[in-house]
């Protein structure tokens, strides 16, 4: 059983673990229990009803939060020529082709949060799959990170577009803001994220798609959300 810090145990006293909280109350509580000295990230954890044994039910896509995540997103783009120029002008942090592939392979360079590639670059970066894949950084058409429209993709990821995927237990974890966000912005981000996840329901999933939702801060306890009221928002 993992040992929790004194701060965590103190914060947990405020949370009734048998209760399912309405969203407004949960937001108040998650901010109250985020007591670390840094600006903690507020995270939404969604348990889905997918069968992970069936690859066609795996979820991978992107969610655009109206107020972003509060985190500065470092974007790397694999592109050449005009596309490379457009990516730089759109605000990409790193742009290159074979040179970036080599930097990642030989130097272990991973100082970025999102990797985008033009379709013609996939042949070049294919060998990075073993490095970027396990870290969720490998460009993919499903996540909108393989595209000819690199400038648009860079701008969206910089603004708050985030990649989401189900883990091996069928859960999705989404950063929805920072403790410093006002309550209304957090609420709008959470509602928007849930609506977008609902639209990703695989055709083969039977029964309830979203089975449970929990809100927490980086270092704080989980706060269970009242699904009925959340899905009505």
From Swiss-Prot:
Pfam families: Ribosomal_L1. Gene3D superfamilies: 3.30.190.20, 3.40.50.790. Keywords: Repressor, Ribonucleoprotein, Ribosomal protein, RNA-binding, rRNA-binding, Translation regulation, tRNA-binding. One of its GO terms (molecular function) is tRNA binding. InterPro entries: Ribosom_uL1_bac-type, Ribosomal_uL1, Ribosomal_uL1-like, Ribosomal_uL1/biogenesis, Ribosomal_uL1_3-a/b-sand, Ribosomal_uL1_CS. GO terms for biological process: regulation of translation; translation. The keyword Ribonucleoprotein applies. One of its GO terms (cellular component) is large ribosomal subunit. Belongs to the universal ribosomal protein uL1 family. Binds directly to 23S rRNA. The L1 stalk is quite mobile in the ribosome, and is involved in E site tRNA release. Part of the 50S ribosomal subunit. NCBIfam families: rplA_bact. This is Large ribosomal subunit protein uL1. It comes from Thermotoga petrophila (strain ATCC BAA-488 / DSM 13995 / JCM 10881 / RKU-1). The lineage of its organism: Bacteria, Thermotogati, Thermotogota, Thermotogae, Thermotogales. The gene is rplA.
């Amino acid at each position: 059983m993992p040992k929790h810090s004194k701060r965590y145990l103190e914060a947990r006293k405020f949370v009734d673990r048998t209760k399912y909280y309405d969203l407004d109350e949960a937001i108040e509580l998650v901010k109250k229990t985020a007591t670390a000295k840094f600006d903690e990230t507020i995270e939404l954890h969604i348990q889905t009803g997918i069968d992970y044994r069936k690859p066609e039910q795996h979820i991978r896509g992107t969610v655009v939060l109206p107020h972003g995540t509060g985190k500065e997103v470092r974007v790397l783009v694999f592109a050449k020529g005009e596309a490379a120029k457009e990516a730089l002008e759109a605000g990409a942090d790193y742009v290159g082709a074979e040179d970036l592939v080599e930097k990642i392979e030989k130097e272990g360079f991973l100082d970025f949060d999102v990797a985008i590639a033009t379709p013609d670059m996939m042949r070049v970066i294919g060998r990075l799959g073993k490095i970027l894949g396990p870290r969720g950084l490998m460009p993919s058409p499903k996540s909108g990170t393989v595209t000819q429209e690199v400038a648009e993709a860079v701008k969206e990821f910089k603004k708050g577009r985030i990649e989401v995927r189900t883990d091996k237990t069928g859960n999705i974890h989404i950063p929805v803001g920072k403790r410093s966000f006002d309550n209304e912005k957090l609420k709008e981000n959470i509602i928007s994220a849930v609506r977008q996840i609902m639209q990703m329901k695989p055709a083969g999933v039977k029964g309830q798609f979203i089975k449970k939702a929990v809100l927490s801060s980086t270092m704080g306890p989980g706060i269970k959300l009242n699904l009925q009221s959340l899905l009505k928002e």
